[in-house]
């Protein structure tokens, strides 16, 4: 029941991030299917215990619950483009970040690792607008394309530091290097 309550609270946050990034071009959703929806979890486990013992593993329970990720009314994994799937993932992560920030006692860090791969320019620009604001706090962005990263940082216009990682060594880049 708590998982279902969480999903009900989480969906609008997630949808608002996806809607912003995609500029309202697509509708997305999440649904939670639980084995214990019509009966208590204890009843579900008791009912399947004999079969579970024969099989050697549990066939029902919370570990078998499904979180359905939808683009319109269809599974995004099967129907979405690579860019739509990436947008979905980014929106999920931003919604998780926002949820943790609002419900937790500390502000989490946000790591966007090679985030702009597979995204068109308009989606990248929308993500930049989101991360440029003060609402997200400290953010780490990685990208293997230096020119691409320079364009992104120029658009953000916020304070930032740039680091180079070579052979496991991290060094801050001086302004003239950046």
Regions picked out by a protein language model, each given a short descriptive name:
Residues 1-109, 118, 122, 126-138, ...:
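Conserved NTPase motor "head" modules and their coupling/switch loops across ABC/AAA+ ATPases, GTPases
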Residues 113-115:
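Walker B catalytic acidic pair
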Residues 142-144:
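H-loop (His-switch) motif in ABC-type P-loop NTPases
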